[in-house]
C-alpha cells in the first residue's frame, strides 16, 4: 500500500492515531518566536492536527497541510472543538506551493518522505518562505547500522544519514541541533529510533 493509503486508514476512525496532546517541542518554538498580531505558522505534514491546533490556541495564524483527506478532516474538527480557526488543506511535501511567508515553520515525522531529488529544492523553498528572524524546526529519522528498521516503516520513507540534516540551512543561526536514540511503541512493537533535530533562525540580512 502507498503512504497515502496507509495514513488514510490509520486516520479514518474517530480516535486520534497520535493522540491530541501537542508535541513538547512547540513550547521551545513559542519561546523563540512568541505570538503577536499577524505572526504566521506553517505545519508541514500536520497529521490529525494536534500541533497545528495548539499553535492556533497560542494566537498564531496557522497554515497546516497533510497528504491525507482524513488527517485534514480531523484537524478541522479538532480546531472547531477547541474553538480556534486555522487554514488546513491537503498537499504534498514534495510538491507544495505557498505564496505566504511564515514566522515559524515546523515539520516532525514527515521530511523522511522527501524524495532525494527534492531535498535541495525543499530547503531552498524554506529559505524563501521564512521571514527574517523566523524559526524552522525539522526532525528526521537517521540510519544506524546497529538499529533495525521499525516494524511500521513504510517503503516510501527514506532514512537520512547522521548529520546530513545539519548541512542544510548551514548559514542560519542554529538555536539547537541534536541527535538522540529513543524507544518507541508505534506499530505495537517496542523498537528504537535515531533522530536528528534542528532548530534554526533565519538572519535578518538574508
Whereabouts are the PLM-identified features?
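Class I (Rossmann-like) S-adenosyl-L-methionine-dependent methyltransferase catalytic domain
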Residues: 1-35, 42, 48-100, 114-121, ...
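A conserved beta-strand element that flanks and buttresses the S-adenosyl-L-methionine
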Residues: 106
Amino acid at each position: 500500500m502507498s503512504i497515502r493509503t496507509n495514513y488514510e486508514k490509520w486516520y479514518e476512525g474517530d480516535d486520534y492515531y497520535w493522540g491530541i496532546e501537542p508535541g513538547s517541542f512547540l513550547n521551545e518554538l513559542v519561546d523563540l518566536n512568541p505570538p503577536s498580531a499577524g505572526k504566521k505558522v506553517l505545519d508541514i505534514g500536520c497529521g490529525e492536527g494536534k500541533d497545528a491546533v495548539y499553535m492556533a490556541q497560542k494566537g498564531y495564524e496557522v497554515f497546516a497541510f497533510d497528504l491525507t483527506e482524513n488527517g485534514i478532516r480531523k484537524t478541522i474538527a479538532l480546531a472547531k472543538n477547541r474553538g480556534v480557526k486555522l487554514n488546513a488543506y491537503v498537499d504534498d511535501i514534495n510538491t507544495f506551493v505557498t505564496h505566504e511567508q511564515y514566522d515559524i515553520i515546523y515539520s516532525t515525522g514527515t521530511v523522511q518522505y522527501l524524495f532525494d531529488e527534492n531535498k535541495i529544492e525543499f530547503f531552498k523553498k524554506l529559505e524563501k518562505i521564512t521571514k527574517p528572524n523566523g524559526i524552522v524546526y525539522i526532525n528526521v529519522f537517521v540510519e544506524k547500522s546497529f538499529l533495525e528498521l521499525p516494524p511500521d516503516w513504510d517503503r516510501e520513507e527514506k532514512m537520512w544519514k547522521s548529520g546530513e540534516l545539519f548541512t542544510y540551512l548551514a548559514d542560519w543561526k542554529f538555536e539547537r541541533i541534536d541527535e538522540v536514540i529513543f524507544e518507541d511503541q508505534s506499530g505495537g512493537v517496542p523498537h528504537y529510533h535515531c533522530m536528528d533535530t534542528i532548530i534554526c533562525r533565519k538572519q535578518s540580512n538574508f
